[in-house]
Amino acid sequence: MKTAQGVSATLTMEVARVQAIASLSKCMDTIPSEYIRSENEQPAATTLHGVVLQVPVIDLRDPDENKMVKLIADASKEWGIFQLINHGIPDEAIADLQKVGKEFFEHVPQEEKELIAKTPGSNDIEGYGTSLQKEVEGKKGWVDHLFHKIWPPSAVNYRYWPKNPPSYREANEEYGKRMREVVDRIFKSLSLGLGLEGHEMIEAAGGDEIVYLLKINYYPPCPRPDLALGVVAHTDMSYITILVPNEVQGLQVFKDGHWYDVKYIPNALIVHIGDQVEILSNGKYKSVYHRTTVNKDKTRMSWPVFLEPPSEHEVGPIPKLLSEANPPKFKTKKYKDYVYCKLNKLPQ
């Protein structure tokens, strides 16, 4: 029987994919040491057990627009996260997106997946990969992923889109098309919730140039889910992130000093407020601090779409929100500079 160290050694000749480590680890009650979190991060020790957090659930079909705006604004100020139901994206579009993503990870040969892998050492985020950024002490998340942009057309590079399954492109383009209307409504509500005109926040964010970056997270079964994390605690760099998970529990939010599981609602859209909306709002809306746990027996997957500025776009507090009594809390800077500072853990 292989030891955890043996598993690591087996994979030293290539980039170690978590999916491969998981299949080698199946018969063991341990995992390689680089996946074992420090005690103050381990889910078993830090999760408030027996309580599932009911984050605000908002009906996007509510005929009372003022009520809906208030609910979205309040959730964004107090929680930084909410779930949308009756959002207008058909269940079939979500099912198709999830079906082709699952097929890519579970049925496409590994050699074919590696054809669209990120180049090691490249600054390009798109492609199939494993670790997104260097963590302190060399720790790793129990997750493989695929990144590619789905909108606008000028930003899309099909080199990073899987050719198999054959319906992958159609399913992702349809989901991206359906999502744009939802994005417009969220931005309008966030804008009105700050006392601005409905169009002002999305215009400050870049309007039609906002980039939709899709990520598929694949968290295989983990022999020690009590010790590992799928994704370490963080806030998103995006304006907002819109996510659909599969049915396996995993998303946790930090609130009132505790980590809580977030209740799964089938086909709801989970919306995270990201760093850039916190900046645009001058701190009125809060970027949500969250992480992902893993499961011993089941594969968890999620499909976040990060709504981001183009790299050269400057983001800062919206001037209309500023006054002597409310000076800017954030610097205005190009998004690429913000990303560089955050990934390298430099002050903003």
Swiss-Prot record:
Its cofactor is L-ascorbate; Fe cation. Gene3D superfamilies: B-lactam Antibiotic, Isopenicillin N Synthase, Chain (2.60.120.330). Pfam families: 2OG-FeII_Oxy (PF03171), DIOX_N (PF14226). It comes from Petunia hybrida. Residues 209-309 form the Fe2OG dioxygenase domain. Pathway: Secondary metabolite biosynthesis; flavonoid biosynthesis. Binds 1 ascorbate molecule per subunit. Catalyzes the formation of flavonols from dihydroflavonols. It can act on dihydrokaempferol to produce kaempferol, on dihydroquercetin to produce quercitin and on dihydromyricetin to produce myricetin. GO terms for cellular component: cytoplasm. It catalyses: a (2R,3R)-dihydroflavonol + 2-oxoglutarate + O2 = a flavonol + succinate + CO2 + H2O; a (2S)-flavan-4-one + 2-oxoglutarate + O2 = a (2R,3R)-dihydroflavonol + succinate + CO2. Keywords: Cytoplasm, Dioxygenase, Flavonoid biosynthesis, Iron, Metal-binding, Oxidoreductase, Vitamin C. Belongs to the iron/ascorbate-dependent oxidoreductase family. It is an enzyme of class 1 (oxidoreductase). This is Flavonol synthase/flavanone 3-hydroxylase. The keyword Phosphoprotein does not apply. One of its GO terms (biological process) is response to molecule of fungal origin. Its main location: cytoplasm. Its EC number is 1.14.11.9, 1.14.20.6. Fe cation binds at residues 234, 236, 290. GO terms for molecular function: flavanone 3-dioxygenase activity; flavonol synthase activity; L-ascorbic acid binding; metal ion binding. PROSITE patterns: FE2OG_OXY (PS51471). The gene is FL. It is found in: Cytoplasm.
